[in-house]
Amino acid sequence: MRVEKGLLYTKDHDWVKVEGNVVTVGLADYAQDHLGDIVYVELPEVDDEVEAGDSLASVESVKAASDINAPVSGKIVEVNELLDDEPGEINKDCYAAWVCKIEMSNPAELEELTNDADYEASL
């Protein structure tokens, strides 16, 4: 499994990239590998407010369906619309095929996430 350095990770195998007060969220390699070929992604709506732990997006594969939960609370400021037409981009490069960006309302919630080294050791 590939673990991208410099990112944070959730217990549900999602990755989080922090850039100022905005986080980018995507599906980690472990999750996409276990799901198999991804055929559909239900994206959140821009301007939606989310709470940490809320369902953010749904990913469906030939094997199963899985939710991506919000790693932090805040407002959706951007979604990766490419995934509407090309959900398999997550399988090609899950760290480039991000799902959405959230403007954080409570950055302290980042402390609940795992750094890359600890995440890799847990796999």
Predicted features along the sequence, with ranges:
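Acidic, low-complexity mobile loops and tails
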Residues: 1-58, 92-123
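Residue-level recognition of beta-strand microenvironments
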Residues: 16-18, 62, 79
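Structural motif
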Residues: 22, 73-75
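Short glycine-rich, polar/acidic loop-and-turn segments at beta strand-coil junctions
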Residues: 29-31, 61-63, 72
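Surface-exposed strand-loop junctions at beta-sheet edges and helix termini
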Residues: 44-45, 50, 62, 71, ...
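Short, Lys/Arg- and Gly-enriched loop/turn segments at beta-strand edges
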Residues: 58-69, 86-88
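Short, charge-rich, low-complexity interaction segments located
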Residues: 76-92
